[in-house]
Amino acid sequence: MTRRRERGQQPVGTRRAAREFAFRVLFEAERGKLPLETVFTRAEGDMREGDDTFAQLNAEALAFARQLVDGLGERRADVDAALRRTIRGWDFEQMAQTDLNVLRLATYEMLYTPEPHPPVIESAVRIARKFGGEDSGRFVNGVLGGLSRSLKTAPRLPQNTGAEDGPQE
């Protein structure tokens, strides 16, 4: 049964809520083997109709969630490659889907947006704790902390390049 939000509840505009919305879209798309666009559109419609499974996002937060979902869709191979370099000794198939999806979203954001790493990591850890297993928060924090340290020594990747373009110098 779908719960409905109370009338008059104001939309939220936090990046954390947008990240959680994007995570839920990614998780549902992966689980149902559905296109990201299809799931995003359905989730947006459910949100607008008052389904409280999804936070009521304001326009800015919804645009940020869209940027994360679309960006990850376009850059997933690069994001997965960065994660594989960071997570040694783990196969993606060994990881909980929740942890992997949280890591993918945060890694995309750390690689391709100007957002500072600490709030990205903090939000990812909170989402992992909320939706994942007992050790998800620690695991996500460790992986993203390692990624952040490695990125401080590497040049930042540009956000708006085509999928076929490599990092620009």
From Swiss-Prot:
The keyword Transcription applies. One of its GO terms (molecular function) is RNA binding. GO terms for cellular component: cytosol. Keywords: RNA-binding, Transcription, Transcription antitermination, Transcription regulation. The keyword Membrane does not apply. Involved in transcription antitermination. Required for transcription of ribosomal RNA (rRNA) genes. Binds specifically to the boxA antiterminator sequence of the ribosomal RNA (rrn) operons. Belongs to the NusB family. This is Transcription antitermination protein NusB.
